[in-house]
Amino acid sequence: MPVGRSLSLDPNLLAQLQSHSPTLWLNPHQGMPLPDFAPTAADLADADARLRRCAGLLAELFAELRLSGGLIASPLQPAEPLKRAARAGHAQAGAWYVKRDDALPVAGSIKARGGFHEVLALAESIAERHGLAGADTDRRALASGAARARFARHTVMVGSTGNLGLSIGMLASALGFRTVVHMSADAKAWKKARLRTRGVEVVEHAGDYAKAVDAGRRQAAGMPCCHFVDDEGSRMLFLGYATAAAELAAQLAQAGRPVDARHPLFVHLPCGVGGAPGGIVYGLKALYGEHVHAFVAEPTASPCVLVQLAGDAAHPRSVYDIGLDNRTEADGLAVAQASPLAAALLRAQAAGAFTVDDRQLFAHLLDARERLGIDLEPSAAAAFGGPAWIAGSDAGRAYLRGRGIDPDAATHVIWATGGSLVPAQEHRRFQAHARAQRQVGGAGA
């Protein structure tokens, strides 16, 4: 049987994916009922409340967070220069912004939102169970000697391509937990080194992300007092990401950008296993409903969420199943199989997905540097082509027409997911590579 035949994928879509051709796919399932296990409004409120009550603790642990009072928040930067530079005039409709999660302190990526939330939830649970904190206790008590001694009896473990490991590792080790990060072959050396300088145990694997996660899960299962952060199915991670929605809503209101039937919001999010974009989309849908249109961006070598959403919902699918190799410079997005939790929710809520090849990643990375003064890692630039796909492609224009959307009234938010902690020499290497490829023929559409 030919590769991909049994996945219930449209043959034309399958051919596009197998050819590594950048593709926009529109989700026909958008608007279907949410699964029964979907988080509730109370779950979202609890996550937001947790991050707020722990803000003082975070400010005490990390000097970088004192300016924000310990809140995990990033700027919303206008992207008018990027819009003006769009190659096709028809891609310039609406107002463009970049959500700067690349600038999140301490962890330097979007993973701070989910990772910090899960570690804080664990720390609160242990402290309350052992009488070290109550419902009204100042959470700075979790940095006390007694709390650290208790946490030292516990291990926090995670599997990661890099950024989630940084997020979990930085906070868990700061609180006194023994911390172990299983890292895939895609993980960058500087991320491993940064963790080790914080006393985190890094276990390196020759395999991909899924193998690193599975190794961590199996090791954790045999250890007492060990909490495994499961990027493929964690509700705590998912809810932490969802808290970004209220932050973005406040920033859009401050910028004078309403979100309603006449003024739709388009959000473009880099996507690996799906948890971070899934959580953010879930939070935004809770606020704006049908007026938010979310598109996830994946490497052409690793479109695991697109494959899962476009295929049979009942069976987990991998990019390997359609003959792709999951090899990309976007190390943070090098994931072969989607999170079942995130995929089930994105199936009901995402407007679609688009793919980006490595040449485009580096072109977008260079645009971010030259037009906006932002230094990104390659995976963080994956979504920069989103507005052009919507306004400049046949499928994108059909999506707008089908919903009666005036493209000039839309707001586009491009999520930049990581880069501020990348060493300067790495940024220079990224940008030199991008300039070299531009000189020999550009990056394509």
Swiss-Prot record:
It catalyses: D-serine = pyruvate + NH4(+). It is an enzyme of class 4 (lyase). InterPro entries: D_Ser_am_lyase, Ser/Thr_Dehydratase, TrpB-like_PALP, TrpB-like_PALP_sf. GO terms for molecular function: D-serine ammonia-lyase activity; hydro-lyase activity; pyridoxal phosphate binding. Pfam families: PALP (PF00291). Transmembrane segments: none annotated. Its EC number is 4.3.1.18. Keywords: Lyase, Pyridoxal phosphate. The keyword Lyase applies. SUPFAM superfamilies: Tryptophan synthase beta subunit-like PLP-dependent enzymes (SSF53686). GO terms for biological process: D-serine catabolic process; isoleucine biosynthetic process. Its cofactor is pyridoxal 5'-phosphate. The modification N6-(pyridoxal phosphate)lysine is found at residue 111. NCBIfam families: D_Ser_am_lyase, PRK02991.1. Belongs to the serine/threonine dehydratase family. DsdA subfamily. HAMAP family: D_Ser_dehydrat. This is Probable D-serine dehydratase. It comes from Burkholderia pseudomallei (strain 668). The gene is dsdA.
